[in-house]
From Swiss-Prot:
Responsible for the release of ribosomes from messenger RNA at the termination of protein biosynthesis. May increase the efficiency of translation by recycling ribosomes from one round of translation to another. It comes from the Bacteria. This is Ribosome-recycling factor. CDD domains: RRF. InterPro entries: Ribosome_recyc_fac, Ribosome_recyc_fac_dom, RRF_sf. The gene is frr. It comes from Exiguobacterium sibiricum (strain DSM 17290 / CCUG 55495 / CIP 109462 / JCM 13490 / 255-15). GO terms for biological process: translational termination.
């Protein structure tokens, strides 16, 4: 039972890490990355549809994203969707494909992005602390119900703290990697 609680805590912490990675992937770091277009929803015959379901999206060059719609009549709709998403990118089209040139980041914008990275990382750490608190409460309840001894509870509580420390380091490393990517000129 207690092992199941520990396993659940580890899975939840891994999800918090994956959530941070996904959040950081949407930050534009000066290099073309198709994941910055993840929030773009295209009005496809009346229903909002993710961009990657109506077009082929790839990066032929370091600072260029090429969007090739499968239905050529969707070109203007895709352009509008990109502008509505407010990504700070100006789409240019030749009627069949859409090009998104990724401008180099200014120093001020880099600093703003690093602040965002820190904010997202802190949110991830708060999630980890909440998971730790929930797990410790579940373990204390088991001790109160007589399932765990006081010594077992202490051991599991230390294990939860070790697990939390491990994931805090993972989050910090993920953030440091993203900050380095952003600050690269």
């Amino acid at each position: 039972m207690s092992q199941a609680i520990m396993k659940q805590a580890e899975e939840r912490m891994e999800k918090a890490h994956l959530s941070l990675k996904k959040e950081l992937a949407t930050l534009r770091a000066g290099r073309a990355n198709v994941s910055i277009l993840d929030p773009v929803q295209v009005d496809y015959y009346g229903s909002p549809t993710p961009l990657n379901q109506v077009a082929n999206v790839n990066t032929p060059e370091a600072r260029l994203i090429l969007i090739t719609p499968w239905d050529k009549s969707m070109v203007t709709e895709i352009e509008k969707a990109i502008q509505r998403a407010d990504l700070g990118l100006a789409p240019s089209s030749d009627g069949t494909v859409i090009r998104l040139a990724i401008p180099p980041l200014t120093e001020d914008r880099r600093k703003e992005l690093v602040k965002l990275v820190k904010k997202y990382t802190e949110e991830g750490k708060v999630a980890l602390r909440n998971i730790r608190r929930d797990t410790n409460e579940q373990l204390k309840k088991q001790e109160k119900d007589g399932v765990l001894t006081e010594d077992d509870l202490r051991g599991y509580t230390e294990d939860v703290q070790t697990l939390t420390d491990k994931f805090v380091k993972v989050l910090d490393q993920t953030a440091a990697d993203k900050e380095q990517e952003i600050m690269e000129v």
